[in-house]
Amino acid sequence: MDIEYLEEESDISICEKVEIISDQESVEESIEMDTTSSMFYDSFISDTSVSDSYNQDTLNYYRLRGEKFMIGDYWPNQKHMTPSMRSILVHWIFETFDAYDFPTEAFFHSVKLFDLYLEKNCVEKNQLQLISIVTLLIASKFDNRRNILTSEISYISHNAYKMEEVIMKEREVLEYFNFDISFPTAIHFLHHFANGTFCDKYTYMLSCYILEMSMLGYELVSVKDSIKAAASLLMALKIKQLEWTELHINVSGYEEADLTITMWKLNAVIKNKSINRYCSAIKEKYKKRINLNIFESEDFPKNTMTKEND
């Protein structure tokens, strides 16, 4: 099964398919709060009752745990996937989770599982979407109270694979990871960086947008999640003409100079015309009022940067 059809407009969108499923079944409403929404900011990021020591202990644990799940440059080993194919599949994962109103952690978790698996396994072209489906299923079970059913996945993915194929591949992927699939992602680091530095709501939301867009580009796959998170916050601060202060250094553990290269990579991904073909769902998310209309704000065209020597 090819993945090209994902580029084309379907007669019915994923959101509409999910609505049909919800109408057909008694679906329990999810109680999870989207961690890249302004409501999450109000309940956690701006919560000054979270102690500095707790925040730092959590970050130390994340860094230690994250070292075990670093992703190398796997592109030379993947003979059947192009950068645009990966962008399409990652966007499909995002669009599906967004349609289900699942927390953003599930999206980051799924994409990292996808990349970790591809790092060590050469996958045929007709199996690439199956891997994305399986990692999506695993993340939905791990990060959400209600997981996506296999039968639902078959429907919203145009019946690309039989249920038996999905179940068998899910078992294979879990066994490959030895069922050890609990790890921090870039969004976890961003939460704690933002909380520890008293980040304002708009800057936090802009950082989330930058970080989510970065997932579409392969260029940042092998960059540490803590660096990606800190660089997205730095980029948002620069756009807002704010500074990377001593507090940011103490909380994140990074000097501005440590993040500059990654920040410009983030900027390049967001400006990439090819990647922008596959990010409609992310842009729609940040047009919503709950997300401060980030994408429709008057200064949004300025939300990328140009090097002085460009």
Regions found by a protein language model. Give the residues of each.
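Acidic, serine/threonine-rich low-complexity regulatory regions at protein termini
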Residues: 1-133, 137-310
